[in-house]
Amino acid sequence: MEKIADSGPVQIFLSRRKLLAFSGASLTVAAIGAPSKGSTQDVVASNRDSISDFMQLSAFATGHKNLDLNIGSALLLAFEAQKHDFSTQIKALREHITKNNYQDVEALDAAMKDDPLHPTLIQIIRAWYSGVIEDETNAKVYAFEKALMYQPSRDVVVIPTYAHNGPNYWVSEPASVDVMPAF
């Protein structure tokens, strides 16, 4: 009988020099790749300020005070990805509203017809009412059932969907049957 050679685990030749070089390289990559705590906090704080500015401007522009913060955050991120100077446009719009003491969006709209910030105002209003920021066929939807255009008639009009009783209809309890039908 012949002995079959053992094909055990592959031997790894690791010398002290290789171990030291590998450890040093790993520590260097970890130190360079990790962001500092201060910079992360600054980004979060500035993002919080821009979300607050966007939500306040949105409340003024739409006339709705109880806007969904999650939808607002998603819309803001989408606008900022589309236009890199969007945050400065928001600040400029808020300063314009404060400086001229506009009471409602209709007065602001009438005064800003030829202003370069007018399209930004219209885009914000349109995004909250339609739930999208683009006109394309495959545009990303940020708000569907919570889009503002469905809110005034949500008790009588079913939101367009393939689900016959509206989105998430299966979540609520079905209506109880008081009298059983007779066949």
Curated annotation (Swiss-Prot):
Signal peptide coordinates: 1-45
Organism (species): Gluconobacter japonicus
GO BP, sorted A to Z: fructose metabolic process
Alphabetized UniProt keyword annotations: Cell membrane, Membrane, Signal
Applications reported: This enzyme is commonly used in a number of research projects to examine the electrochemical properties of enzyme-catalyzed electrode reactions, named bioelectrocatalysis. Available as a commercial product from Sigma Aldrich (catalog number F4892).
Cell compartments where the protein resides: Cell membrane
Pfam family, one: FAD-SLDH
Name of the featured protein: Fructose dehydrogenase small subunit
Quaternary context: Heterotrimer composed of FdhL, FdhS and FdhC.
Family statement: Belongs to the FAD containing D-sorbitol dehydrogenase family.
GO cellular component, one term: plasma membrane
Function: Subunit of fructose dehydrogenase, an enzyme that catalyzes the oxidation of D-fructose to produce 5-keto-D-fructose.
Modification after translation (UniProt): Predicted to be exported by the Tat system. The position of the signal peptide cleavage has not been experimentally proven.
